[in-house]
């Protein structure tokens, strides 16, 4: 279990992605994920250790999973809602996100909402990073009686993928 801590109060602790599907290649870039909270919302941070990430899509809601992409799937309140959010972002900062019951049943999110996440990407020689904030007010649009509690346990998954990259990986 991963304890979500208050932003800028504790040293960052990362979850590292270690499991990849066998795609017939050995491409398994190291990915670190961290999530913290503040009075504004949840702050997600990824370190992706790959050089020259493939990033063809530039607009929110494009199929960014085809690019070099990181994904966070999260139930913000599994007791009040059986739906989860999927946040998928590529190295251009383009995000695909919606509120899902499952793969086929989902509620769309507006471009204005995605713009409020303040997505920041930084690409360096052998690493790229992604930072964004999910405001509590955004969550309340979909989970009406959502109330953040400091010691909440969030069910979530973190992924790295690239369907159309030089070395397909999941």
What function would you assign to each model-found segment?
Residues 1-170:
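Structural preference for beta-rich elements and adjacent junctions enriched in aromatics
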């Amino acid at each position: 279990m991963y304890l979500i801590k208050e932003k800028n109060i504790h040293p960052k602790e990362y979850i590292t992605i270690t499991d990849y599907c066998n795609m017939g290649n050995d491409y398994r870039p190291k990915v670190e994920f961290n999530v913290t909270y503040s009075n504004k919302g949840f702050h997600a941070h990824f370190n992706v250790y790959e050089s020259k990430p493939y990033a063809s899509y530039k607009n929110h809601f494009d199929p960014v999973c085809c690019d070099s992409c990181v994904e966070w799937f999260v139930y913000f309140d599994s007791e009040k809602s059986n739906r989860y959010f999927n946040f998928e972002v590529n190295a251009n900062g383009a995000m695909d996100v919606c509120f899902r019951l499952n793969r086929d049943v989902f509620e769309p999110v507006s471009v204005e909402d995605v713009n409020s996440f303040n997505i920041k990407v930084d690409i360096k020689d052998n690493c790229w990073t992604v930072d964004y904030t999910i405001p509590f007010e955004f969550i309340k649009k979909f989970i009406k009686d959502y109330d953040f509690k400091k010691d909440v346990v969030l069910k979530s998954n973190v992924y790295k993928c690239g369907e159309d990259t030089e070395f397909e990986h999941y």
